[in-house]
Amino acid sequence: MLMSDSLNAAALDQLFRTARTQNAFADTPVSQEVLRELYELVKWGPTAANSGPARFVFVTSADGKAKLKPALSEGNAAKTLAAPVTVIVAHDEDFHEKLPYLFPHADAKSWFDGPREGRAESAFRNGSLQGAYLILAARALGLDAGPMSGFDNAKVDAAFFAGTPIKSNFLVNLGYGDPAGLFPRSPRLSFDEAARFE
């Protein structure tokens, strides 16, 4: 099936034009079923060699938030602890071990064999892509998102990924946004400021 039909204006508004980065959320839980549905969308987004290096931790419990709290910057702590869900968007630097399953028509694993540092860049780049897919998938499902990078990655890695090749990238608060927490919308660069034709 060719993807030839554009989304309608309402869908584009929900995903991009009227969507906002949320700083406050309604006191409404997000079910595990919705979070599983979210991942089922995210996993279809393209990554190099279908590598899918992102790993997601959906922090919803009081114990999980308490474990996360010491890593948060002062300005992000209150809103993160109050959010129904905080997603740790991370990436597995040994993602290549799953390539024989994920990319069976070529020996893609051999492309990334060797020291872990040599594949860390690909894990970070493609895991970042998947984190962006997560934000858009959340909006598509009627959730609001508040992505941020104001935290101590080393502390998150020690608390959630100790002894593994998984590294945190950024956090995304999820829930049903409270407009009272929004700032006035900031401008964006125009096409001519940010892009060009060659």
Swiss-Prot record:
Top-rank EC class of the record's enzyme: oxidoreductase
MF GO annotations: oxidoreductase activity
Keyword line: Flavoprotein, FMN, NAD, NADP, Oxidoreductase
EC number: 1.-.-.-
Cofactor dependence: FMN
InterPro entries for this protein: Nitroreductase (IPR029479), Nitroreductase-like (IPR000415), Nitroreductase_HadB/RutE (IPR050461), RutE-like (IPR023936)
Family per similarity comment: Belongs to the nitroreductase family. HadB/RutE subfamily.
NCBIfam families: PRK05365.1
Protein known as: Putative NADH dehydrogenase/NAD(P)H nitroreductase XOO4267
